[in-house]
Amino acid sequence: INAFFAKECVVYALVAGLFSAGNGIVASFLLPLAEERGIPNISLFFSINAIVLFLMRLTIGKLIDKTDLLLIVVPSLLVSAFSFGLIGYSSSFWIVMIAAVFKALGHGGGQISLQSACIKCVPPGRVGVATATFYIGADIGQGFGSILGGKISSVFNYGTMFYLTAIVIVVVAGLFTIYEIHRRKTVPKDVR
């Protein structure tokens, strides 16, 4: 199994999967939420999100190389959670567009940082396996988010589903902080 997965970066891949789960939820349920609430031109969410995400990816690389992982991933998770809370609350076009910006900022900082961490935590001969592990986590998250979002929205409603997503992201931010602090105490500094 070591030939297919880099166990050193499974936690990073799972957290990255949470960002992808958010993508699956937004892609599947933003339009029905907008129709339910009468929010027009909802497709602009995806355009705004893509533009900000593109700009974020152009600029975040240098910051990632100089900044502690926790100082990027945890705020990115919290910003993402805020965006899902905004979507859950939204009743107007502009609130959804603001959420698009925040979602891109969170996703852009978080996923790139986690991918970089996956690559850094393995020897050079396992970079491909680490990258594959990262993307497996992202792929699982994408599918799982849509499925779980469908179950939650069928029991409650779309707004509640987005609120619950925000809560899960905040909890994961806390758990990731605990994990990373513990990992740093147990892993030699030159392996981090």
Where are the predicted features?
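Helix-breaking motifs and short loop linkers at transmembrane-helix boundaries and internal kinks
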Residues: 68, 89-91
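Structural signature of the two symmetry-related core transmembrane helices
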Residues: 71-86, 166
